[in-house]
Amino acid sequence: MLKLGDIATARLLFRRAVLAGSAEAALDLGMTYDPLFLRQLGANGVDADMNSAHKWYQRAHELGSSEASRRIERLASTPRP
């Protein structure tokens, strides 16, 4: 769904997978809110939310994602609008 640009559906599917304990889904869900990722994706009309991105990256970290810590650090160094 992300590759197709359907962020809303991707978020819904990722949330369901997070409820099942998926660290990868939590990481992916965080990415759907991450302003850097959304910019790279070229997702126009989708609001970035750094707080939500951080929340889901933190959850991914709690579930065992090693990538989540890097994403949290990168997000922390991103200038806020």
Per-segment meaning from a language model:
Residues 7-8, 50:
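Short hydrophobic/aromatic segments of transmembrane alpha-helices and their interfaces
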Residues 35-57:
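Short coil/linker segments at helix-helix boundaries
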